[in-house]
């Protein structure tokens, strides 16, 4: 299984997963992540598939990207977390919350909304 690249700031059991927008990468959130880590979060800045230093694949939809996040959390032994998604990352985060509601403590979406 291919794994997602990430930068982790902080070392607590309060996990905040940050999912960037289209054509972005986790590192785009580093300034905010440093602040959140200082506030007691363990912040995971993830490069989603086909972005940053993560693997590239012709398979590219929100359900698959939600599965990528589940594999990442399993690999890191994270049972439940707060997920913050921006733009495309927000769609991934919402899909993850629908597919794996037991893994989401809180869901934050920015600059995106669900279709009605």
Predicted feature locations:
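Alpha/beta-hydrolase fold catalytic core
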Residues: 1-17, 38-41, 78-79
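Active-site glycine-rich loops that stabilize anionic/oxyanionic intermediates
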Residues: 13, 21-24, 87
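Structural cue for short, hydrophobic secondary-structure segments
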Residues: 18-21, 45
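Alpha/beta-hydrolase active-site loop signature
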Residues: 23, 48-52, 114
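Serine-hydrolase catalytic-loop signature spanning alpha/beta hydrolases and amidase-signature enzymes
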Residues: 23-31, 43
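Short, hydrophobic alpha-helix immediately C-terminal to the catalytic nucleophile
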Residues: 30, 70, 94-98
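Active-site loop/oxyanion-hole signature of alpha/beta-hydrolase fold enzymes
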Residues: 35-38, 42-84
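Conserved hydrolase catalytic core segment
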Residues: 79-116
């Amino acid at each position: 299984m291919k794994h997602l690249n990430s930068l982790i700031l902080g070392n607590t059991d309060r996990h905040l997963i940050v999912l960037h927008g289209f054509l972005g990468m986790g590192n785009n959130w580093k300034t905010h992540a440093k602040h959140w880590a200082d506030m007691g979060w363990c912040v995971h800045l993830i490069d989603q598939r086909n972005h940053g230093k993560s693997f590239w694949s012709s398979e590219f939809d929100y359900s698959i990207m939600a599965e990528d996040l589940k594999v990442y959390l399993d690999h890191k032994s994270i049972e439940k977390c707060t997920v913050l998604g921006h733009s495309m990352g927000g769609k991934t985060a919402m899909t993850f919350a629908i597919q794996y509601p037991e893994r989401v403590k809180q869901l934050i979406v920015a600059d995106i909304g669900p279709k009605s």
